[in-house]
């Protein structure tokens, strides 16, 4: 489960689980609540989003019906495509914990390091306003 900001492409949160139902959607939405309330949430037609999004009062739920809609979920699908290409090189994960760790590192790279052509070659964190010196970027990379 992922939540991505549509303007900055910053991955706000992820939740790895063995199941993909409404309780997991509740979990990821609760995890990102401290970051603020969005005006809208865009999702595909998967049923598990319905009830969790209804609990976010005042938030519009836009369920993408087709690729020809005015509003699409292309941003998250693009992220998923990049993630799957990276994941295939790993030949699976050795454990649930290692999967969480590796996904966290991928998201760190995606948010803070990887330039995005649609964001004038800035990583999402910089597009969102984070300003880091080159030294601080290197320090964060070493920690990750």
Tell where the protein language model's regions lie, with residue ranges.
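Mobile genetic element proteins and their domesticated derivatives, centered on retroelements
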Residues: 3, 9, 41-44, 77, ...
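Active-site beta-loop-alpha junctions of metal-dependent nucleic acid enzymes
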Residues: 14-35
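Short, aromatic/basic amphipathic alpha-helical patches
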Residues: 50-57
